[in-house]
Curated annotation (Swiss-Prot):
Binds 3 Mg(2+) cations per subunit. The strongest magnesium site (Mg1) is bound to the beta- and gamma-phosphates of ATP and four water molecules complete its coordination sphere. GO terms for cellular component: aminoacyl-tRNA synthetase multienzyme complex; cytosol. The gene is aspS. This is Aspartate--tRNA(Asp/Asn) ligase. Aspartyl-tRNA synthetase with relaxed tRNA specificity since it is able to aspartylate not only its cognate tRNA(Asp) but also tRNA(Asn). Reaction proceeds in two steps: L-aspartate is first activated by ATP to form Asp-AMP and then transferred to the acceptor end of tRNA(Asp/Asn). Mg(2+) 3 binds at E353.
Length: 430
């Protein structure tokens, strides 16, 4: 019966096991050959002393190529110097598929490679244990998100990704051919989430792709990303901030508990964030930046440099709240007594924005005026606006970038490292 490398323990000494995997490395010392076999769970040492294995197996081991796929059946022995404290003395080795040489990428990471080179040969890059660890952790992150939101009473939904209207206005849209009509890839599930509040769902969440034709080509931008979105009725921005910070804390706790081995591969030690996360207003963030030499005119978005200065002072996870109404989308609710300020927030990790959210405008007339104030035509939002005429409850929500959450949690230098096959301004293949 097949076992994974991580399941082979010293206390199994004398037992016969079968393993499948890739040849990570071969060391030929003449009368002694070592093969490191790698599967998705780790690496185990296959030891072939000439005197204790068959001539056929020994001969095969000497000529086997790295990254070939093999099956090994043999006896478990204790060996403190070997990975995991065990080795396998094989009675048989079968080459299931031989790899070509030379390899397009060095899986052992002895030879460093630029990220672009790694992405060009992504299938090979993904074999690296450190890279696999990122995606095992990502799997746990998404599982924890679903479990937490389901426990909180949210209903998972899936909204259209082909739309006829820009969610947030602007030109960051990918046009597509949709029979005889003009259509776009959706920037966000925002409009549909809000319509579902009018439908009486009260609490919804979606985990799905978003598409933004942004010109930015930075270490934190993607043109296709996975967004974790919620919308919640009968609450305000403070209510959904509470959900967000508890969700993030739960994700950290679950990853720390269930992904200890993969965190070890990445040499990452997770610190569980404490609740509540610190909160500062937009004005306070401007003051911090100004004190450190970066002046931001009121009403403008905070520059990258300003956010870095604020992040240096705040550290870790924190909220920036009460943004200028004009800097947020048309659906953000302004304060009644200060209409120039919106009931909105961004969740930051250092200088990196992870999430953006707000209480939404739920009053039809106010929403129409807000759309007009942004220079858009209410007629373009017909299906959306109709939902506000027949009993739309007060509601709030947010969108959280899955890749940015993982990037910041693991200290990755580039958000593309958290995506299997990233899409950016210059990359459409693989």
């Amino acid at each position: 019966m097949r076992v994974y490398t991580a399941d082979v323990k010293p206390e199994m000494e004398g037992q016969k096991v079968t393993l499948y995997g890739w040849v990570h490395e071969v060391r030929d010392l003449g009368g002694l050959v070592f093969i490191l076999l790698r599967d998705r769970e780790g690496i185990v040492q296959i030891t072939l002393p000439r005197k204790f294995v068959s001539k056929q197996v020994f001969k095969l081991a000497k000529k086997i190529r790295r990254e070939s796929v093999i099956a090994v059946t043999g006896e478990v022995r204790r060996e403190e110097k070997a990975p995991g404290g065990v080795e396998i003395i094989p009675e048989s080795i079968e080459v299931l598929n031989e790899a070509d040489a030379p390899l397009p990428l060095e899986v052992t990471e002895k030879v460093p490679a630029e990220l672009d080179t790694r992405l060009d040969h992504r299938f090979m890059d993904l074999r690296r244990p450190r890279v696999q660890a990122i995606f095992r952790i990502r799997h746990q992150v998404m599982q924890s998100v679903r479990e937490f939101l389901s426990e909180e009473g949210f209903i998972e939904v899936h909204t259209p990704k082909i739309v006829s209207t820009a969610t947030e206005g602007g030109t960051e849209l990918f046009p597509i051919s949709y029979f005889e009509k003009e259509a776009f890839l959706n920037q966000s599930p925002q409009l549909y989430k809000q319509v579902l509040m009018a439908a009486g769902f009260e609490k919804v969440f979606e985990i799905g792709p978003i598409f933004r034709a942004e010109e930015h080509n930075t270490t934190r931008h993607l043109n296709e990303a996975i967004s974790i979105d919620i919308e919640m009725s009968f609450t305000d921005h403070n209510g959904v901030m509470d959900v967000l910070e508890r969700l993030v804390q739960r994700v950290y706790e679950d990853v720390a508990e269930k992904c200890e081995r993969y965190l070890g591969w990445l040499e990452v030690s997770l610190e569980i964030p404490e609740l509540p996360f610190p909160r500062i207003t937009y004005d306070e963030a401007r003051e911090i930046a100004a004190r450190k030499g970066e002046e931001i005119p009121w009403g403008e978005d905070l520059s990258t440099n300003a956010l870095k200065l604020v992040g240096e002072e705040m550290g870790g996870l924190y909220f920036i709240t009460d943004w200028p109404t004009e800097s947020k989308p048309f659906y953000a609710m302004p304060y009644e007594d200060r209409p120039e300020i919106s009931k909105s927030f961004d969740l930051m990790h250092g200088w990196l924005e992870l999430s953006s959210g707000a209480q939404r405008i739920h009053l039809y007339d106010m929403l129409v005026e807000s759309i007009k104030a942004k220079g858009m035509e209410p007629e373009s939002f017909g299906f959306y606006l109709e939902a506000f005429r027949y009993g739309m409850p007060p509601h709030a929500g947010w969108g959280l970038g899955a890749e940015r959450l993982i990037m910041s949690m693991l200290g990755l230098k580039n958000v593309r490292e958290a995506v299997l096959f990233p899409r950016d301004r210059h990359r459409l293949v693989p």
